[in-house]
Amino acid sequence: MKKILLFLSVLFVVSCSKDDLVEIKPDNQIVGKWHFNTYTIDNVDAVYDECKQKGYFLFLNDGTGQEVIYFNNSTYGCKLDSTKNLKWSFNGTEYDIKTFSGGSYAGVTSFGITYQYFGKISDEFLKIPVGYNETINLKKE
């Protein structure tokens, strides 16, 4: 009996290793308010100005949210530029984020536009590629 217990103990210790542990990140890690922080163009990082950093993506538990953009105008200063509704989902590796424009521009009714982004959370930043060599980096509040 002692030999069987010893064999089972050794088998248990040998069969488990750190490599077998898989870190699973929850899909709701994105929930909260993420402010514009930095952006990257051609592998060069730059910091958004104070006005742009007031803007954010807000992700809610129900898969909806808002994108809020501020713009610094030399005449009027830092002003709210746009607010868009969004929907988000998580496929296990990246976030699918869709923003929807309100269907008007400068008071003129037009068709609505949907923008689609794919983002990943890395080093406490939500990184969203937005162009060929461009990425916006948002930091959670």
Where are these regions (language model features)?
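Positively charged n-region of N-terminal signal peptides that target proteins for export
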Residues: M1-I4, S17-K18
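Sec-dependent N-terminal signal peptides
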Residues: I4-V13
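Lipid interaction determinants
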Residues: S17-N85, S89-E141
